[in-house]
A protein has these predicted regions:
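P-loop NTPase motor domains
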Residues: 1-211, 226, 293-314, 322-324, ...
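Conserved ATP-driven motor cores of ASCE-family P-loop NTPases powering translocation/secretion/packaging/pilus
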Residues: 203-304
Length: 379
């Protein structure tokens, strides 16, 4: 989760000289998430405080001076942990840098978490979810993720959802011999308008685990804009099936796909007539299977299907309701009133850490028999 938040694109090469700050921010965020999960259980009323907004609140509070010399609240918190605690290890890079570097690392974490500060998102993120990867893969089910078109600030949730769910599904597949019990398909409509995320492993690692990704875009240029030329080529090369149609008159994608369709050999000829004689010539020439102009003029409802191992096919694809598929009643999203959100704080976390450590039984050292040292000294 921390890696997805700090580096959603998954490309470490773009960090340059700031690689240390991003790596340290990833470790610090992992550390805070571990502490929140371990030491902040639900309160006596059952209110859950372990959510991503509490992580932001904790990092903001721990950035402030502690009043103990020049140490920040985060450094004081780490001092209260055992030297072998994993949270302390993850935060090692941030703890062993300068004061200014420490502030830069924590500011990087806060900037990455700013996107989660939304009252509407809180109602989704700060409460338990019914989505469970293991049950989702084992049962016949579907998840619909609907994002508001008028508010693009929430688009990052699509990539975050796909990345985390796919990683959990990878773990489920590994527990069942390397494959999921049922095939899982991600239909990513308008993928080209979404912020870039680490999508490439889904194509390489997902196929062998019965996990399929269906990216739906309007133009190949959208992929190149978000993932670069090399990333766009990798995504295109990993698509075993390609369906396209309905091109705009000025579409450049039609030219690319026309070349991908290949060519055929046709017979052409010419006739020349003169005053005294006529001549005729025939020759075989190469011609595109479908030219860009022909692709752009495809009637509505007509599509080209390209599949690995077969020749391209032109077909008509109808909407689902024309196949006789209907629903008994429209699905209504249940309305939920504004629920109160509870947050974890620095003082609560520190108190729970001390309470947990002090309540653990101290190791008992073996006592030496009476007179041991004296008898040894006499010898």
């Amino acid at each position: 989760l921390a890696k997805t938040i700090v580096n959603p694109g998954g490309d470490d090469q773009d960090r340059g000289q700031n690689a240390f700050f991003y790596d340290a921010a990833e470790g610090l965020l992992t550390s805070v998430i571990l502490l929140l999960a371990e030491y902040v259980p639900p309160d006596s009323s059952g209110h859950e405080k372990r959510h991503i907004v509490s992580v932001f609140k904790l990092v903001q509070e721990l950035l402030a001076p502690s009043g103990q010399g020049k140490k920040t609240g985060f450094q004081v918190l780490m001092d209260n942990l055992p030297s072998t605690h994993k949270a302390r290890w993850f935060a090692g890079a941030a703890l062993n840098t300068s004061e200014q570097g420490m502030a830069s690392v924590m500011s990087t974490v806060l900037s990455r978490l700013n996107a989660f500060l939304d009252s509407e998102l809180e109602q989704v993120l700060c409460f338990d979810s019914a989505i469970d990867a293991e049950h989702f893969a084992a049962e016949k089910s579907a998840i619909f993720l609907v994002l508001p078109e008028e508010d693009s600030t929430k688009n990052f949730m699509a990539g975050l959802m796909i990345q985390n769910l796919s990683r959990e599904l990878f773990s489920v597949a590994d527990e069942h011999g390397g494959k999921l019990q049922n095939r899982v398909v991600f239909y990513c409509d308008e993928l080209g308008t979404m912020p870039p995320f680490d999508i490439l492993p889904l194509f390489s690692a997902g196929r062998s685990r019965k996990l399929t990704l269906v990216p739906i875009i309007q133009s190949l240029a959208q992929l190149e804009k978000n993932y670069g030329k090399e990333g766009a080529e990798i995504i295109s090369d990993n698509c075993q099936d390609t369906i396209f149609g309905g091109f705009a008159p000025n579409s450049q994608t039609a030219e690319t796909l026309s070349k991908a369709l290949g060519s055929r050999t046709v017979l052409t000829g010419s006739v020349s007539r003169g005053k005294d004689s006529n001549s005729q010539s025939l020759q075989m020439v190469e011609r595109a299977l479908l030219s860009p102009d022909e692709l752009k003029s495809l009637p509505k409802g007509n599509f080209i299907v390209m599949k690995t191992g077969t020749h391209p096919m032109r077909t008509k694809l109808q909407l689902y309701f024309k196949w006789g598929i209907s629903f008994e009643e429209p699905y209504q999203v249940p309305e939920r009133a504004q629920r109160e959100v509870y947050y974890a704080g620095k003082e609560e976390l520190l108190m729970n850490i001390k309470k947990s450590l002090y309540s653990q039984p101290q190791p008992v050292t073996a006592s030496k028999p009476d007179g041991y040292m004296s008898s040894y000294a006499e010898k």
